[in-house]
């Protein structure tokens, strides 16, 4: 266990306060920091020493945020990340609820419920804007540029997931009905979508490196293929059904792709694992 690990466990709040004062007040001496926080200069010196030794803090008291995050990525929780993660969790909860609702609307051909889902989508737009406002107000002070850009992109991806759910709801409003004999397949697909979303947000929150997102993605596409084949076996004269069903499949596929994209963004941010520049659908040889 290094000095950082030992120190942060009991003195995180004071250390965060010191860093905040350095960033916001630009003090020239440790006495100024101590006076601002109501603690002794000796205590300030003790907490700052490891940061100065690692060149994370330089005199006259400038913080190298990139080094701070490399040494202790959990430090960002103390200042800004907690607020942003709370908003991302709210977006996840809204999306999971809307997935359940749109599945019910699809299963029961419930146009009124589908219309309500479309209206609910605006809540996700507001949450994405909330993240962007938080970042625009604070990111330059407390987060490296890579964090701000990645978190804004993750919030944008979550908002787009809401759009795909709203698109499915619109197809229900326009008359999309699925046969009873494919209910099990459709139920499995929505279960996988919820698992993929939950996994994506977990990677963002926990910063874990190992993820099952690609395994879930593979299961999703196998189930989509099974569903498509089953639908094509039951030939219909209504061409409009195939158009609507095709749009439904496309939105499901895009939902899964966005979940993978969120994980890729998080892995690049936290672990420097480069993202594949080729979109998921093109990697599968599909346009």
UniProtKB/Swiss-Prot annotation:
Top-level taxon: Archaea
One GO biological process term: intracellular phosphate ion homeostasis
Stored Pfam families: HTH_24, PhoU
This protein's name: Uncharacterized protein MJ1641
Protein species of origin: Methanocaldococcus jannaschii (strain ATCC 43067 / DSM 2661 / JAL-1 / JCM 10045 / NBRC 100440)
């Amino acid at each position: 266990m290094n000095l950082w690990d030992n120190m942060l466990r009991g003195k995180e709040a004071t250390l965060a306060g010191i860093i905040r004062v350095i960033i916001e007040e630009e003090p020239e001496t440790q006495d100024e920091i101590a006076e601002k926080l109501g603690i002794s200069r000796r205590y300030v010196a003790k907490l700052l020493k490891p940061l100065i030794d690692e060149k994370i803090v330089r005199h006259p008291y400038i913080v190298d945020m990139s080094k701070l995050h490399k040494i202790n990525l959990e430090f960002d929780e103390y200042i800004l990340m907690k607020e942003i993660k709370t908003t991302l969790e709210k977006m996840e909860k809204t999306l999971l609820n809307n997935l359940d609702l749109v599945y019910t609307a699809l299963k029961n051909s419930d146009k009124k419920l589908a219309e309500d889902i479309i209206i609910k989508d605006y809540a996700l737009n507001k949450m994405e804007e909330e993240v962007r406002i938080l970042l625009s107000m604070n990111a330059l002070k407390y987060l490296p540029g890579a964090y701000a850009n990645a978190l804004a992109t993750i919030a944008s991806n979550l908002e787009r997931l809401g759009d795909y759910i709203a698109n499915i709801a619109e197809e229900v409003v326009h008359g999309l009905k699925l046969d009873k004999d494919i209910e099990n397949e459709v139920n499995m697909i929505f279960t996988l979508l919820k698992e993929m979303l939950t996994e994506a947000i977990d990677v963002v929150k926990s910063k874990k490196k190992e993820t099952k997102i690609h395994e879930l993605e593979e299961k999703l596409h196998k189930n989509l293929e099974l569903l498509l084949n089953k639908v094509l076996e039951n030939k219909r004269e209504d061409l409009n059904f195939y158009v609507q069903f095709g749009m439904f499949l496309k939105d499901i596929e895009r939902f899964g792709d966005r979940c993978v994209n969120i994980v890729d963004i998080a892995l690049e941010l936290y672990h420097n694992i480069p993202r594949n520049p080729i979109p998921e659908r093109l990697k599968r040889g599909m346009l």
